Amino acid sequence: MIQEQTILNVADNSGARSAMCIKVLGGSRRRYARIGDIIKITIKEAIPRGKVKKGEVLKAVVVRTKKGVRRSDGSIIRFDNNACVVLNNNEQPVGTRIFGPVTRELRIEKFMKIISLAPEVL
C-alpha cells in the first residue's frame, strides 16, 4: 500500500533512482495505491544524464509493493521493496527497460508495454 510521502524505487532506465509519492490518483479522498494504480511522484534521486531530473513531478504506475497483491486462488504475491515505473503524459513508460519482476495484475490495468518489457511476470 503506497500513500503520500512513501519513497519508492524506480524500476526502469528513465534515469530516476528513487521517487516519492505526492498524490494517489483516482478519487478525491483516495488514500492508498496498490499494484497497477497510477500515482503522482517527484524524483528524489537521479543519475546525471538521465531522461528525468531530480525535482520533476511525473506520473508513475506501481509495479511492486511490500504489501503484495491477493490472487483469486488465495495466494499472495509480496515483494521486498516498493517500486514504480515512470510514465509520460500519454501514460506510456519513459524508460525502455524494466528491472525486476512485475505481476500479471498490470495486464488488467492495460499496461501491456510494461509487461512486454519486464524480464519476469509473476
From Swiss-Prot:
GO MF term list: large ribosomal subunit rRNA binding; structural constituent of ribosome
Pfam families: Ribosomal_L14
Keyword rRNA-binding on entry: yes
Record-level GO cellular component terms: cytosolic large ribosomal subunit
Superkingdom in the source lineage: Bacteria
Keywords associated with the record: Ribonucleoprotein, Ribosomal protein, RNA-binding, rRNA-binding
GO biological process: translation
The keyword RNA-binding appears for this protein: yes
HAMAP family (alphabetical): Ribosomal_uL14
Task of the protein: Binds to 23S rRNA. Forms part of two intersubunit bridges in the 70S ribosome.
Quaternary structure annotation from Swiss-Prot or TrEMBL: Part of the 50S ribosomal subunit. Forms a cluster with proteins L3 and L19. In the 70S ribosome, L14 and L19 interact and together make contacts with the 16S rRNA in bridges B5 and B8.
The protein's name: Large ribosomal subunit protein uL14
